Amino acid sequence: MNIVIIGAISGIGKSLFEKYANENNRIGIIGRRVHLLDELYQKYSSKPLPTKADISNLEEIEQAINALHKEMEYIDLAIMCSGTGNINATLDYDVERPTIDTNIVGWTFAIDMFYHIFEQQSNGHLVAITSASGLRGEPMAPAYSATKAYQIN
């Protein structure tokens, strides 16, 4: 199976990558922290196709998804695990902006790209992993909760 995971370098995304890497899958991973991409590449005997991109940078994420799609020719499964958030009790916009750019703007852009790839292929599966914070809210991290509610809905 050909799989692309955005946010595969830490947390749930990394665990999913490790599970799929131990099976007979071809995996493209997208993340912004190059040293962590390199660690996965080395640890798994060059199995992943690592691509550096920051999901909040639409040009980078478009290039990364297109490059992996071209390399793989077909994507069976896309998993969205990326996300960020900050403690910000005062709702300072400068603190919230990266959360909005990552969890709403970049996330929506990537979802849209995968949707069109799957539409073109007439097949494909999309998994979006988000947070229970989108259901109950976090008063100290308001943008994080709001962006996760957006993803859930």
State where each predicted segment sits:
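Conserved glycine-rich cofactor-binding loop
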Residues: 9-10
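Rossmann-fold cofactor-recognition segment
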Residues: 44-59
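Conserved NAD(P)H cofactor-binding loop of Rossmann-fold oxidoreductase domains
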Residues: 81-87
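Short alpha-helical oligomerization interface
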Residues: 89-101
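Active-site helix of classical SDR
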Residues: 111, 147
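Residue(s) in the substrate-gating loop at a strand-loop-helix junction
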Residues: 131
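Active-site loop immediately N-terminal to the catalytic Tyr-X3-Lys motif
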Residues: 136-142
